[in-house]
């Protein structure tokens, strides 16, 4: 006697690859990887699903397997002999799934951030060249501070550009949620660079030259280059501000909220760094004017110290912002409330427990919840879809004939279908949550068996 066990692979979020992990008889788990080919999905774990099962020791009674492409996923039918059930677990899949995968790219709507970084990169290189030339001829301490500032800015923009590129890598086995947080890492490194190289070195340079005995030479040339740098940095700042506005519009935030709580740190980092650059140039100009008017050279290193403190404040702000993103920040309260309200109002949900969310990348979230399902509503929804009369007829016939074996078989089949119906309800909830908040890329819903001490949300 044979029984057919169906396994559904959810490939909705991975149109080219998928894997299944299922249990048969509650005692065995097996896992397979599928690649999408022209003629459907093909098992690539061990050439065929049959060889995968047979590779496990103590596995007996395998009759046949069949895997077909069913549009949104893969349907696999495994026929087994009831008398020789699967009794072992296939565990060697771990080595297979932890191999390094070929790096792919994913599309992220961050053109505004990329444009801001690229513009700032070239502008900082041009400004650095101008400032370095002026410092070489004038030996101004405040201009030296601006040279160091430009070096730090250029290096930091390069780090941000690398972070943008690396964050677009597609998810793989080692990082199933993707690499979107890479931009947080490199933004944090960039901020540390501003603090150490930009702020620290600039302040030290100013303190060391507080007792300079003579004003810096060639101040006129320095003033001209400061003006030119101001125009270049100002243009880059305008591009960064436009980038921040677009990012805020995409996330439905005000510009102020986006600067403090937005999910993409890149454009904010560019804007704050360019803003500090423009302010630093204004401070440098004021310092040179003060030296020229008073003849006192102390205003030159004082300007350097002020610029260094400005960079330090910018760096601390960026460090804190990226730190919160890296340690696992929840998604916005508005989106979270929207999801919880939807779940509480759904007919199959009795109670919610341990609901959590996390930002896994710019505009991308993960949501998790434990749900106490309303079993009666799950069954009613299932019977509405399949027809209750068919099941009632089978139960009546088994009861009329007094066939306990047939009754047990019907009850087993009915129980299996109810479990499948619960899975369908979970799939429906996950899909509707993602439609409600499109930024939620991953939804994990678990069935919860409540106890009197459980704190319901």
UniProtKB/Swiss-Prot annotation:
Tell me where it resides: Vacuole membrane
Question: Which terms in the Gene Ontology molecular function aspect does this entry carry?
Answer: monoatomic cation transmembrane transporter activity
Identify the residue ranges that face the Vacuolar compartment according to the record: 137-141, 205-220, 289-297
The alphabetized UniProt keywords are: Membrane, Transmembrane, Transmembrane helix, Transport, Vacuole
- List, alphabetically, the Gene3D superfamilies matched: Cation efflux protein transmembrane domain (1.20.1510.10)
**What membrane topology does the UniProt entry give?**
Multi-pass membrane protein
Tell me which Gene Ontology terms the entry assigns under biological process.
zinc ion transport
Q: Which domain of life is it from?
A: Eukaryota
Per the UniProt topology annotation, the Cytoplasmic ranges are 1-115, 163-183, 242-267, 319-457
Q: In terms of one coarse class, where is the protein primarily found?
A: membrane
Q: Give the family, as the similarity comment puts it.
A: Belongs to the cation diffusion facilitator (CDF) transporter (TC 2.A.4) family.
Protein name from the UniProt record? Metal tolerance protein C4
